[in-house]
Amino acid sequence: MAAGCLLALTLTLFQSLLIGPSSEEPFPSAVTIKSWVDKMQEDLVTLAKTASGVNQLVDIYEKYQDLYTVEPNNARQLVEIAARDIEKLLSNRSKALVRLALEAEKVQAAHQWREDFASNEVVYYNAKDDLDPEKNDSEPGSQRIKPVFIEDANFGRQISYQHAAVHIPTDIYEGSTIVLNELNWTSALDEVFKKNREEDPSLLWQVFGSATGLARYYPASPWVDNSRTPNKIDLYDVRRRPWYIQGAASPKDMLILVDVSGSVSGLTLKLIRTSVSEMLETLSDDDFVNVASFNSNAQDVSCFQHLVQANVRNKKVLKDAVNNITAKGITDYKKGFSFAFEQLLNYNVSRANCNKIIMLFTDGGEERAQEIFNKYNKDKKVRVFTFSVGQHNYDRGPIQWMACENKGYYYEIPSIGAIRINTQEYLDVLGRPMVLAGDKAKQVQWTNVYLDALELGLVITGTLPVFNITGQFENKTNLKNQLILGVMGVDVSLEDIKRLTPRFTLCPNGYYFAIDPNGYVLLHPNLQPKPIGVGIPTINLRKRRPNIQNPKSQEPVTLDFLDAELENDIKVEIRNKMIDGESGEKTFRTLVKSQDERYIDKGNRTYTWTPVNGTDYSLALVLPTYSFYYIKAKLEETITQARYSETLKPDNFEESGYTFIAPRDYCNDLKISDNNTEFLLNFNEFIDRKTPNNPSCNADLINRVLLDAGFTNELVQNYWSKQKNIKGVKARFVVTDGGITRVYPKEAGENWQENPETYEDSFYKRSLDNDNYVFTAPYFNKSGPGAYESGIMVSKAVEIYIQGKLLKPAVVGIKIDVNSWIENFTKTSIRDPCAGPVCDCKRNSDVMDCVILDDGGFLLMANHDDYTNQIGRFFGEIDPSLMRHLVNISVYAFNKSYDYQSVCEPGAAPKQGAGHRSAYVPSVADILQIGWWATAAAWSILQQFLLSLTFPRLLEAVEMEDDDFTASLSKQSCITEQTQYFFDNDSKSFSGVLDCGNCSRIFHGEKLMNTNLIFIMVESKGTCPCDTRLLIQAEQTSDGPNPCDMVKQPRYRKGPDVCFDNNVLEDYTDCGGVSGLNPSLWYIIGIQFLLLWLVSGSTHRLL
């Protein structure tokens, strides 16, 4: 009872301190503070409304309704038309694939194998030839073509349509009999390549990837420009590309079983670790995998206790775990295989439900574990592949028997150089049932999104397997061949798909997106992977092709729809329905992350979706309520067109304001430029020469930009220019859907930093989703211009109703001078007379902090000079204890989101971080041990070095220097996290006491009506030391969500509808095993280890 009375007394005293009416109290009353805030709000809104001319622009749109019509955005109709267009595009590409595959099978069947070729008999263009033809030599039996290249805008590189190009992996000798035969028969594909292009000039890369590693692609283009990337080792192998892996075999359920007994130690253990990592790289997102180790007992190597999807994050977890395994104990194959079969046959978890495989990596042993195979695999539905790793004297018989008796294959990995080739050849075995199935397996598949190796940017690839249809005769019976020749592929750029989903009538917050059966997006405005390599840009990739390419681009860009947006239950439902191929529509309120990823807004969105027939993709259209209609200009009179276009000329900037035009594809012949002045000149010159209705132009786009140019010019001429200079206003601006940005006066426009593409302007998109005036501080940059130079931006969407239809065609605003605002701010919040030291917001007060924050928690105004120098900075870095308390009392809510498309400096990412879209990234520890780069590169050099003893000059293109090695690791894929803060409720006032242990700080806050601002008055942090741990909003490296938890509740997905994993006609007697290493190979291995020792030693010295 006494405690209750004490609590009541304490609360009463606190309330009297905070809201007591007497001017004698130490803290201003809530009524007083609200009166200050109401005056600030009135002054700010009146200033913004008057200076921006928001009402005047509404009047202009209403006045000139005869110059435009209001057209509906019928979401269902739009999404179905776009889906049909995408279906047609992919169908045309599929026809090209079928023609190529049929011709390849026909030509190869007629090809006569030859052991010898006459000099210069095989003619081809080697894509890795130096651009200087004098530096190229042909191998015996072949002759090099020297194409004439031209720069091609479609590919963004040098192209020859007269020839195809051939890429041969570095570790394959191009003069070998196998390669010469492949070159010989695949040359017939060139005519089909050309015919396909004649029928469809929009075709991009057409590629045949051979099971031998040779890749023939059309049109011809140099693989690399050696002047840009000198002395770089080429590690590309077509058989490791995601599209080849997907096309070569049906999905896989793979259990990798690793022997960690005491005999597996030293170099053998290191070889196993690297082999398992390489094996994991042969898996795609349609596959499922886990890794287990065994000695006298068996266990999972990681936290995964069952098969998991072979996406990049999960494979990274497994690789990290494998790198930490140690060897001890004795080998018990029975325990290992029992564990593997139990897990592989567990159907209670998500899995591929197709090829079931056990991959055994061991140094050998005497046990066959026959009873285990009899128990679990009598019907041989599980294939067993065995790998004898390292140099040892064990009898290979037992582990070879395991493979042969279980429809698998036996491989030997005696050294580093054998890893890459032997960890990918199992795909040939898995391809047997597909070949035997014949036409049933001839189904075009479309891949996930990935970065094209030849710098085309983001692409998807249609694939079709190519079979060896040559008959084999045994006992006078014609047996079908079961060898896969390779995979045919045709690329489709995402830019081509985007062109079928026009965006410029949807408003900036409307967009299309598409997903595949894994739920990964192939089309989405937030699909912006950052290229990995030297000199990484600091912004997201927006161009068609990145400037940097790297072997890591082989990995698909797997961004889940629920990671591309802010997840909620309705979006989960939409994703599931899209994967199931259903059509539907949902309208709901959702959180929306801003373009600059600093803010979160709330808005109503309508999602409309439909399947893309003939594919596994599904397409959706997202529209806010204010984009159900759009403006279509009807500038039929050339006089009006000319008058409006005149306002875009730089000579008129003094009168019309500095003008920007969005860089869009207005006309085919109009070159887009990043230089606004240059682009405007080109645009005006083009319009002067050709009318907007020219067949090469998009008349709707041009007429809309001209309409907006005219309307915004009238705002400048008839309103802004007639106003006297308004104190505190540095600039006025108007931005439109049509792509016009006008900044007045001209001088202010010369320092304008916003994106001229209005559809990608963060403040513009935010203004559309908010009914209030949106205040935005410039980015805080210690070394760059601050708020004093650029001012505070205030923006408001122009809202009009035409015949009852809501439109938001533009945003107007001003930039406020910081000094003027400070003067008004302090004047408004000064109390006279002031009876105590804490009764008002005196400038640079020692005892009182007064700040204005925006809805994201960024500082916009303060009564302290050291604060105002930090305008634009997140308040959690300025006063972290207060910001934490504001979150705790629900003034602010927050959302933590992850970016799986980031790149980081090596070592910057957390140790256990999992990059969402990386290929295997070698760590420093890897380099110090064997090193992925060093192994692959060293083996390639050694192989070709020994070959060059017979064929001089072979090594000329494969030199490697320490600087190149270091530079290649300058960036790596990683996950970053960022936290966005937003107002959590509609409460306008709040008060409290911030308890800091030995002291406390009273505070009171008020939101400014019709704005996104909040005023806070608080006792200075200098008077009461508190928690100083910074609260970070900015992007920072992260482990991401715990993958061990994520696999327990995997997201819904669907695998391919068909599976080719077994066939009764399969001949599995060819199951591997060689007669041992001949002396020359032992010699190669000896030199290889010597080189690796030298590389390792020099690396230690460098580090």
From Swiss-Prot:
InterPro entries registered for this protein in UniProt: Ca_channel_alpha-2/delta, VDCC_a2/dsu, VWA_N, VWF_A, vWFA_dom_sf
Tissue specificity as recorded in UniProt: Isoform 1 is expressed in skeletal muscle. Isoform 2 is expressed in the central nervous system. Isoform 2, isoform 4 and isoform 5 are expressed in neuroblastoma cells. Isoform 3, isoform 4 and isoform 5 are expressed in the aorta.
Record's keyword terms, sorted: Calcium, Calcium channel, Calcium transport, Cell membrane, Disease variant, Disulfide bond, Epilepsy, Glycoprotein, Intellectual disability, Ion channel, Ion transport, Membrane, Metal-binding, Phosphoprotein, Signal, Transmembrane, Transmembrane helix, Transport, Voltage-gated channel
Topological domains annotated Extracellular: 25-1073
SUPFAM superfamilies the record matches: vWA-like
The record's account of how the chain is modified after translation: Proteolytically processed into subunits alpha-2-1 and delta-1 that are disulfide-linked.
Residues carrying Phosphoserine: S119
Signal peptide (UniProt feature, chain positions): 1-24
Location in or out of the cell: Membrane; Cell membrane
UniProt comment concerning the protein's domains: The MIDAS-like motif in the VWFA domain binds divalent metal cations and is required to promote trafficking of the alpha-1 (CACNA1) subunit to the plasma membrane by an integrin-like switch.
Protein's recorded name: Voltage-dependent calcium channel subunit alpha-2/delta-1
Encoding gene (name): CACNA2D1
